Amino acid sequence: MTREEAIKKIIFAMDVKEFSDVQYWAELLSQHVGMFKVGKQLYTACGPAAVRMIQKCGGEVFLDLKYHDIPNTVAMATLEAANLGVQLCDLHAMGGYEMMNKTMETLDKNFSGCTARPKVLAITVLTSSNEETLRGIGIELPVPEMVVKLAKLAKSAGVDGVVASPQEVELIREACGKDFLVVTPGVRPSFASADDQKRIMSPAEAVKAGADYLVIGRPIAAAQSPVEAAQKIVDEIVAG
């Protein structure tokens, strides 16, 4: 794998709330990561302006708002995300088949024959969760089995891929095929701590398992030199 290919796999989690920080990180890292993730805190604080600033700095965007509501509401919200020109956006697989399918039909209808729509991802089981977490909400399945079940449901609904722990990537590949996108948080390079993630893997391990994109935040943001940290992660991926 080339360095350019490795860079494209990294999604920097822009976990900030100040608009000035958006421009800072976008300008600093736009040549060193493939995409920027805008989550709930930043989007609530700054709205679409955060997305536009990243785009102005030449960056691509994963709008990570994890929609989960009645089908029409999620479909319309996802359409608005798509109209912002983001590359990735997501919803919860636990919202069910109808919610996911309605969303994909709405996007395909509105983007038919024109600009390519963003890829839509379904959240499976959050990387901060484990089997005890699932039991607490009445789910008795082991985490890997639940992840695969949700991934297969998402694929059947027309969703482009999933967000899942790197530990489940190989299982998802077996169940859903090589063209189904897999985005993995819970990735920690050799120089970083696990923080609040429970199901983690190194960048090289996650890519080897078949991950298309790696979501990485604190190991880069908290480093003395964020650019050097990003470059080290690229080194790890290339070295395999």
From Swiss-Prot:
Active site: 66 (proton donor)
InterPro entries associated with the record: Aldolase_TIM, OMPdecase, OMPdecase_AS, OMPdecase_bac, OMPdeCOase_dom, RibuloseP-bd_barrel
SUPFAM superfamilies attached to this UniProt entry: Ribulose-phoshate binding barrel
The organism of origin for this protein: Citrifermentans bemidjiense (strain ATCC BAA-1014 / DSM 16622 / JCM 12645 / Bem)
Catalytic activity: orotidine 5'-phosphate + H(+) = UMP + CO2
NCBIfam families per the UniProt record, alphabetical: PRK00230.1, pyrF
Keywords for this protein: Decarboxylase, Lyase, Pyrimidine biosynthesis
Protein's name according to its UniProt entry: Orotidine 5'-phosphate decarboxylase
Binding partners and assembly: Homodimer.
Superkingdom classification of source: Bacteria
UniProt-annotated binding residues for substrate: 15, 37, 64-73, 127, 188, 197, 217-218
A single GO cellular-component term on record: cytosol
CDD domains assigned: OMP_decarboxylase_like
Entry's family note: Belongs to the OMP decarboxylase family. Type 1 subfamily.
Gene: pyrF
GO molecular function, one term: orotidine-5'-phosphate decarboxylase activity
